[in-house]
């Protein structure tokens, strides 16, 4: 069988114990990066002694103001680049694989696309911290003018540590604890009311903190976002928000607690990976009708929060997907007609395409019916494919031009049949030690990582504006894990 033959040839390099025999492997001494104490040095774009092909130019903002789709691009030399830096070189410089590699300029470009789209509107861009909670990423977004959307007390603490303006932060969630709500009240962030007991807890927290809390009502508009059921949040079966049949009860209750809370707006969130902006328009139309109804009862509403959820091109098919400008233009007139401040909560569309998950191939095998590429990354570091059946584009960092192409499942070392990063992917057969990346890994990947099988969370790096690489999170170590057991009684 042809596939079996090419797999046999692919496994031959495994017999050579000398890793330097792989022509694409970069000597760690040849590349430098930010060290543990924060010093930064540039990474050379190419370490070849031959005259290299020029790397692709770093992605720039499109003429119409839309952010470019991808910052990771294949060069004429066959290597994968991030903003002009070879990913192969980043692998040689990293403390270990797997790791996450970001483009800092792409984060800026993505935010700029939202900022430009919101021109002419009063607005708050509230970054969904749950998508990616790296402190350096948060600090960058705060510097750009982002607020923060939070769903736990620790996310609130992290946002405050990152320097976010509390008056541009929103505390969401269907199970907020009293302790976390007291912190929210003391901090001065907006708080969304999600249920009857949530309202009671918010009032109690306001009294404990001695602060009047600005609140929004999270109304479930029962709009089908046409996405995976696990990421749909605005339909009638969702655990989030209040049903419109109960709206009057909440309004009456809020009036009775006027010394403790102030109703300042309404909120909805439809789901995630949404690729049709008319869904946002339909929801916004329902929400402004609620605004009219609530204002008619004497409430002075200022804010309309339409949530987030804009999808991205995970399949890398160059499909025409809605942009931030498309999204905002569908609701612009509705917002202006009611003189509202618009709050949006992007997460995935701000951060997903800025990052890839970089792995090293452990080996290639076949069980007679399936071909497998086994890598050192796994569902522990990136669970979306296992959890949602999600597709993320996968490619080799520096494939050999002579490698035969076959269909593979890309799997990790975790002791679960569900441990896969991709299935049925046509790829050149890689050598042992080759680099393999999972694209669009900036959102809901590292933030959902676990220590299952005692796989420790990986390091993170980003490419700076000047082409240098900086470590933005160190990898967890076994010693870090053991510290949880220090000084415990026998």
Swiss-Prot record:
Residues 1-44 form a transit peptide. This is Probable diaminopimelate decarboxylase, chloroplastic. It catalyses: meso-2,6-diaminopimelate + H(+) = L-lysine + CO2. Belongs to the Orn/Lys/Arg decarboxylase class-II family. LysA subfamily. InterPro entries: Ala_racemase/Decarboxylase_C, DAP_deCOOHase_LysA, De-COase2_C, De-COase2_CS, De-COase2_N, De-COase2_pyr-phos_BS, Orn/DAP/Arg_de-COase, PLP-binding_barrel. It comes from Oryza sativa subsp. japonica. Specifically catalyzes the decarboxylation of meso-diaminopimelate (meso-DAP) to L-lysine. Pyridoxal 5'-phosphate binds at residues 309, 345-348, 444. Its EC number is 4.1.1.20. Its cofactor is pyridoxal 5'-phosphate. Homodimer.
